[in-house]
Structure formats: C-alpha cells, structure tokens
C-alpha cells in the first residue's frame, strides 16, 4: 500500500504575523521538521504552496512540489486538499499542516498501520477531540476528492461540516499534545516555554 504525505504550506499566517512554516524549533524550520517526519512515515512527500520558491532552498530531502494557484477568493486547507488530491498517485494521503511543532513519528506510524487495515469504503481516518475532527493531521483516500467540490460550490470551506458527509474512521489519540499547532505569537511563545 502506497502512502504519500501532503504538507500544506500556503496559509497567510495573519494571526502569527510571520510565515509559520519558517518558525524555528531547536534551530529547524517547522516545514523542514514536518517534511522529515512525514518522510519517515510515508513513501513520498509533497508540499503544496502557492509560493514554493519561498521554501525550496530550505529542503535537502527529496520532496515533490505542488504549486497551488494564487487565491482569487476565499481559500483554506479544504480548498487546497481538493486541488491537490487528484495530482498525487497514492492509496492514502497523510494531510499535514506545516505548523505542528510536536508532531512525532511513532504515533503516525501506528496510525499508518491501522489505516492499512481499513475497508475500501472508508474514505478518511482522523483523530477526534471534544472540539471535533483534527483534519490537518489525517489520512484521506484520493477517491474522496469528488465529494469536496459540491461542498466548496456552496461556499462552504469548513472541514468539520464536510467530514460529516463522508465515511471517516476515528483514529485513537493517546496524547493530544502532539496535535498542538501555533497560530499566534503567544501560542509560539508558550510552546517554547513548555
């Protein structure tokens, strides 16, 4: 079974005030860290960004680049997923945000092993917390792509609502800490102090 990782590095980072993909944790930009971890779990790594030139010189490990079209209206991670899925040849795609500083190899490998056993009609496998699904660290079959377009055509961009319309397997979550992302300078500072 072939697994590809798709890392989204195209957000505007408005609340952070700087590019989250370039934030350094222990001297390593988050995008490099995320791609290194993804490469340990998946057979290939893809990075989706409207500005790949911004990041290409940072990465030494082999990755594939998807140059997302420049936004002409409201975008978001669901729009990026819909655009990228048909371009990647894999049985499953591990979708990752680029700003997951506590992402870890072992839990992702355990999830991959579970996902390999899922029935064909399961279209996504994602962890869930009391706030809802954690879609930016989840597994998706490429065949799910056609279900996204009707959702987007209604002006909807929310993962939670869309995921309610497809067959999703909940993945066990033993430690929520590695799902933490950073959206503001305060979040980033708190993470560095912990």
UniProtKB/Swiss-Prot annotation:
Region forming the signal peptide: none
Binding site for GTP: 8-10, 20, 99
Residues annotated as transmembrane: none
Subcellular location per the Swiss-Prot or TrEMBL entry: Cytoplasm
Residues given in the record as Mg(2+) binding sites: 99
Catalysed reaction equations from the record: Mo-molybdopterin + GTP + H(+) = Mo-molybdopterin guanine dinucleotide + diphosphate
Molecular function (Gene Ontology), one example: molybdenum cofactor guanylyltransferase activity
Pfam short name (any one): NTP_transf_3
EC numbers on record: 2.7.7.77
CC annotations in GO: cytoplasm
GO BP, sorted A to Z: Mo-molybdopterin cofactor biosynthetic process
Disulfide bonds: none
Requisite cofactors: Mg(2+)
Annotated keywords: Cytoplasm, GTP-binding, Magnesium, Metal-binding, Molybdenum cofactor biosynthesis, Nucleotide-binding, Transferase
Family, as annotated: Belongs to the MobA family.
Function comment: Transfers a GMP moiety from GTP to Mo-molybdopterin (Mo-MPT) cofactor (Moco or molybdenum cofactor) to form Mo-molybdopterin guanine dinucleotide (Mo-MGD) cofactor.
UniProt note: domains: The N-terminal domain determines nucleotide recognition and specific binding, while the C-terminal domain determines the specific binding to the target protein.
Protein's recorded name: Probable molybdenum cofactor guanylyltransferase
Organism, scientific name: Synechococcus elongatus (strain ATCC 33912 / PCC 7942 / FACHB-805) (Anacystis nidulans R2)
Chain's gene name: mobA
